[in-house]
A protein has these predicted regions:
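Long mid-to-C-terminal assembly/interaction modules of large eukaryotic proteins
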Residues: 141, 145-146, 156-158, 162, ...
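Conserved phosphate/anionic-ligand binding catalytic regions in large, soluble enzymes, centered on
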Residues: 26-41
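Conserved phosphate-binding loops in nucleotide/dinucleotide-binding enzymes
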Residues: 17-25
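C-terminal catalytic subdomain
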Residues: 40-162
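Primary mode marks residue(s) on the alpha4-beta5-alpha5 output face of response regulator receiver
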Residues: 1-16
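Conserved small/polar residues in nucleotide/adenosyl-binding loops
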Residues: 199-206
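Solvent-exposed loop/linker segments at secondary-structure transitions
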Residues: 19, 36, 46
């Protein structure tokens, strides 16, 4: 026999369901929101995710990424409701000041995370024939990553970029770009997103 862990809220399910739960979390309901907040949190001078959640613009940003852009292609595991899950993430987990998570920590190895956290949603839109022009904020996250790689915050001051195995390579790619300049040659972004996403459409420049 086994202990009645279900009385404490534990869910028993098969491996396929576990995989679906993981995809729901990693591709839609948690990890993409974390990455979006980490990129912009570093550039805006935040040191805590919970503090970012007090910024109505950032809160609205991740709500729209999750509910409007990613949720149409969410993997539904059946045993958990994706809408209830993301609601708990946005309203309880992320604003919790007793969970002292830092955008700088979450931004570690971002180059290794973009493909699964955002690229899968883009590919799912294409696979289902959905209108990719509805993707506005996910491309904005990717555009923000190019800006993040410059290591200059919103006040024009340098900040320390989190460790990443591709950091030197990616910084070399965006080196021709200047922060807060006008018209520039953005062709280097194709190489950046091809390297991080193994996927090149839609262009984050369109954000």
């Amino acid at each position: 026999g086994r202990p009645p862990l279900e009385l404490g809220g534990v869910l028993y399910c098969d491996r396929e369901t576990v995989d679906k739960i993981e995809k729901m979390k990693v591709c839609t309901c948690l990890n993409p929101l974390h990455t979006a907040m980490s990129i912009y949190g570093c550039m805006l001078g935040y040191n805590l995710i919970s503090a970012e959640m007090a910024d109505e613009d950032l809160r609205s940003f991740i709500q729209k990424i999750g509910y409007i852009e990613a949720m149409p292609v969410v993997v539904d595991p059946g045993v958990l409701n994706p809408y209830e899950f993301i609601g708990a993430v946005i309203n309880r987990r992320l604003p919790n000041p007793f969970m002292p998570d830092a955008p700088q920590r979450i931004a570690t190895d971002t180059s290794q995370k973009l493909a699964i956290r955002f690229g899968e949603t883009i590919k799912a839109y294409e696979a289902r024939g959905l209108d990719k022009s509805n993707l506005v904020l996910i491309p904005l996250v990717l555009a923000g990553y190019a800006r993040y790689l410059k290591g200059i915050d919103d006040n024009g001051q340098p900040f320390e970029i989190s460790p990443d195995p591709l950091l030197a390579e990616l910084q070399a790619i965006v080196n021709p770009l200047e922060v807060k300049e006008g018209e520039q040659d953005f062709s280097c972004l194709k190489a950046l997103y091809s390297r991080c996403l193994l996927y090149t459409s839609p262009s984050p420049r369109d954000a």
